């Protein structure tokens, strides 16, 4: 929001430098990006009067002009502008002057004719091309007839103004207007602002409602207020220079007297308005409704836009003519032939307008204000002010009466707060009089009783609803620098990690000790990637306004992000990569308002865990390596129930023959295995193994009691056993049976060989184990070990059908 200090002085008596004003605004209200001085860097640019204008003897487009610049003799200047003519007052850059772009003007010759200066267009003075009126876009700017030759040109163009460029935060939409900013500065400097008065004269011979008919079909929440005025016999012409100056200093291009009037009122009141060419309406009909599927509208920028069913439309009959609160349609644009204006003033829902502006990538001055909120109590006043201004500038008449499609009973907000609460929050000892004075400066009517303030908040401050908002206003006006510094009171406490935080921290250490590097992936991904590798069935959570098509949906799994990271590394010739990530996934059910956040931990390895080196053979990653990492990690959690791995083909993104679900007791807590070759190809990665665990579930599971046990001082005894067993019997089943039958002194069971080649019958495999026995208190007797070992052999034969070899 650009605030002209010249315009601001219409409201307040401020003999204060712009830099000081900007600093005060920034310290008290909103951020300031800087102070703009349009004439900065320009020198010796004056008003000129073209006395004569003759064709150049050696050019078909140049002119040789004699120009009075207030000196004893006129200057001869060669100019190529098509609109230069004798008698015009123009902008002259004298010899040795500086103009826009740090350009120095010198005496020169143009095709043999001396030229002692330059006749300037606005963009040559540094004006943004987007702000230059179209009628002078290809020529020089013509100054008013009363401009005095030789005077510096800056005051005639508003370039002597100082403009404060504010970055208005979403909660302070009231400062997107001159009125709102004036109220803010009046409170800061303890002044009473002079607000503009509206002098509207209606033509009693015409009634607006006789010609203009408005129907609002949209929901009252979407369109709480919709009003119109009718202005007849309007002449469309360029705006007077004072208005053009105010418009371009506000950062907008002057168009014509009607459009400029609506933009002027927009800047003054913060109320978006829209002017329709009444003669282009269908029998004077205005209908406000939601768009239908498949409808199109060509907007003022010439773009044909396919409308969405969430878009609010202004229609004439059933024909869309305007995207409500965003941009008008080309069909009802005000042109030089327009004579009757249908003027709209309305309140539209902020969310609706924000969605429309985002969906169509169409952000305008109007949509920005609707998104941040507008003063509902000022809509009718702004509409009247614009109608009066259009009638004055266009020599028209305002038809009597306002046509109301829908009205809103705007009631001020009342907030109650007591002095003790204010001082408690701010750490101050403010008096009743001090706080009352601040509310008076804010122009908030206040009733005080028993040290309690009942504050009536004007409709222009729609951001204030609760006591905390009033405390913020008091702090701002009192001055943040004046608030006392208060040391914390109370007994200090020592912080401690909770169980989840401690497990997460330990998990990271364990993964890194296993050779994995931490990765942090985006929580947002595509809908397809979000659903991939999900441990449990869930709805997805999608953003209403994603920043890109690649970041639309909250993830259900960490693995997809890790595979993206692997692909990134593989594309850069890094093929031996081992990553892990600890983070949240987001599960959602239809009845939930927001998704449930669950801590997961996942890993992915590809290439070789041990690269080829001198004396060391390369060891490509395989299922057993990643399963070993998972097993070691789960062991560190000291879970009470047994961990089991069950082969599965339920994960379509995983290899069906090399994937296992992980259970603790009967609860599914994760999976481990090889990524399906098709999935790996889609990600452009090599053979890859992954795991993912539900960390929240693991933390909640019961833990085994951990007790210290000293290392035995007595020797151990080992026994080896080899067996033929059915191919579908798992190692876990065999180990569980051996542990069950092995006796009190069995300490460890280790699988050391698997064979199913030649000499092994079909459907069978050979497994070999080492069993370690040890007593904590005495040296084991060989007979005791033999007895226990034979019980194991018997159990293997009887219960698993094993053939001992």
UniProtKB/Swiss-Prot annotation:
It holds the Pfam family tRNA_bind. Residues 410-485 form the B5 domain. Binds 2 magnesium ions per tetramer. Its EC number is 6.1.1.20. It is found in: Cytoplasm. It catalyses: tRNA(Phe) + L-phenylalanine + ATP = L-phenylalanyl-tRNA(Phe) + AMP + diphosphate + H(+). It is an enzyme of class 6 (ligase). Its cofactor is Mg(2+). GO terms for cellular component: phenylalanine-tRNA ligase complex. Residues 39-154 form the tRNA-binding domain. Tetramer of two alpha and two beta subunits. This is Phenylalanine--tRNA ligase beta subunit.
């Amino acid at each position: 929001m650009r605030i002209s200090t010249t315009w601001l002085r219409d409201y307040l008596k401020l003999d204060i430098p712009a830099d000081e004003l900007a600093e005060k605004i920034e310290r008290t209200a909103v951020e300031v990006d800087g102070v703009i001085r349009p004439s900065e860097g320009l020198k010796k640019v004056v008003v000129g009067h073209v006395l004569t204008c003759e064709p150049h003897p050696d050019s078909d487009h140049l002119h040789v002009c004699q120009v009075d610049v207030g000196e004893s003799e006129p200057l001869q200047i060669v100019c190529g502008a098509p609109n230069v003519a004798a008698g015009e007052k123009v902008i002259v850059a004298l010899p040795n002057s500086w103009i826009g772009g740090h350009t120095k003007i010198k005496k020169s010759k143009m095709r043999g004719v001396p030229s002692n200066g330059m006749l300037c267009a606005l963009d040559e003075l540094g004006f943004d091309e987007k702000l230059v009126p179209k009628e002078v876009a290809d020529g020089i700017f013509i100054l008013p007839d009363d401009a005095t030759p030789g005077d510096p040109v800056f005051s005639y163009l508003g370039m002597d103004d100082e403009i404060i460029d504010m970055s208005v935060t979403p909660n302070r939409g009231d400062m997107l207007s001159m009125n709102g900013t004036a109220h803010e500065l009046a409170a800061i400097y303890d002044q009473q602002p002079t607000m503009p008065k509206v002098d509207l004269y209606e033509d009693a011979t015409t009634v607006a409602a006789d010609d203009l008919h408005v129907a609002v079909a949209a929901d009252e929440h979407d369109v709480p207020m919709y009003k119109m005025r009718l202005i007849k016999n309007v002449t469309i012409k360029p705006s007077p220079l004072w208005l053009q100056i105010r418009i371009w200093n506000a950062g907008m291009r002057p168009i014509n007297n009607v459009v400029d009037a609506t933009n002027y009122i927009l800047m003054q009141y913060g109320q978006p308005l829209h002017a329709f060419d009444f003669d282009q309406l269908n029998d004077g009909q205005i209908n406000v409704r939601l768009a239908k599927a498949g409808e199109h509208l060509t907007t003022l920028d010439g773009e044909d836009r396919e409308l969405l069913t969430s878009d609010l439309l202004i229609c004439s009959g059933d024909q869309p003519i305007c995207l409500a609160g965003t941009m008008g349609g080309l069909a009802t644009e005000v042109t030089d032939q327009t004579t009757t204006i249908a003027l709209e003033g309305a309140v539209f829902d902020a969310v609706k307008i924000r969605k429309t502006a985002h969906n169509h990538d169409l952000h305008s001055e109007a949509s920005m204000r609707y998104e941040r909120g507008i003063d509902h109590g000022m809509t009718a006043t702004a509409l009247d002010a614009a109608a009066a201004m259009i009638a004055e500038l266009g020599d028209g008449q305002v038809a009597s009466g306002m046509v109301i499609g829908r009205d809103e009973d705007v009631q001020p907000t009342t907030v109650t707060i007591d002095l003790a609460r204010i001082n408690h929050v701010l750490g101050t000892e403010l008096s009743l009089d001090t706080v009352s004075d601040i509310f008076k400066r804010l122009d908030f009517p206040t009733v005080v009783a028993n040290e309690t303030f009942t504050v009536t908040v004007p409709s222009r401050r729609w951001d204030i609803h609760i006591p905390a908002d009033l405390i913020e206003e008091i702090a701002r006006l009192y001055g943040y620098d004046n608030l006392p510094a208060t040391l914390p009171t109370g007994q200090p406490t020592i912080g401690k990690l909770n169980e989840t935080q401690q497990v997460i921290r330990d998990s990271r250490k364990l993964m890194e000790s296993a050779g994995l590097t931490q990765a942090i992936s985006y929580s947002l991904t595509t809908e397809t990637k979000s659903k991939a590798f999900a441990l449990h069935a869930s709805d997805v959570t999608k953003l209403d306004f994603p920043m890109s098509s690649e970041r639309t949906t909250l993830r259900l799994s960490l693995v997809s992000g890790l595979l993206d990271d692997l692909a990134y590394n593989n594309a850069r010739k890094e093929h031996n990569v081992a990553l892990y990530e600890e983070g949240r996934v987001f599960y959602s059910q239809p009845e939930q308002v927001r998704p449930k956040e669950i801590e997961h931990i996942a890993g992915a390895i590809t290439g070789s865990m041990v690269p080829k080196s001198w004396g060391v053979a390369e060891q490509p990653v395989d299922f057993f390596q990643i399963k070993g990492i998972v097993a070691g990690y789960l062991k560190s959690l000291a879970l009470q129930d047994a961990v089991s791995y069950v082969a599965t083909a339920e994960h379509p993104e995983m290899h069906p023959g090399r994937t296992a679900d992980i259970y603790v007791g009967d609860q599914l807590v994760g999976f481990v295995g090889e990524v399906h070759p098709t999935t790996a190809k889609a990600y452009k990665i090599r053979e890859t193994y992954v795991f993912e665990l539900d960390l929240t579930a693991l933390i909640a599971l019961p833990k085994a009691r951990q007790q210290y046990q000293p290392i035995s001082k007595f020797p151990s005894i080992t026994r080896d056993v080899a067996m033929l067993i059915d191919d579908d019997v798992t190692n876990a089943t065999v180990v569980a049976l051996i542990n069950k039958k092995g006796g009190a002194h069995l300490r460890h069971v280790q699988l050391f060989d698997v064979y199913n080649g030649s000499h092994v019958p079909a459907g069978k495999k050979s497994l070999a184990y080492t069993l370690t026995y040890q007593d904590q208190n005495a040296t084991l007797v060989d007979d005791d070990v033999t007895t226990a070992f034979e019980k194991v052999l018997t159990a293997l034969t009887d219960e698993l059908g094993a053939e001992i070899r």
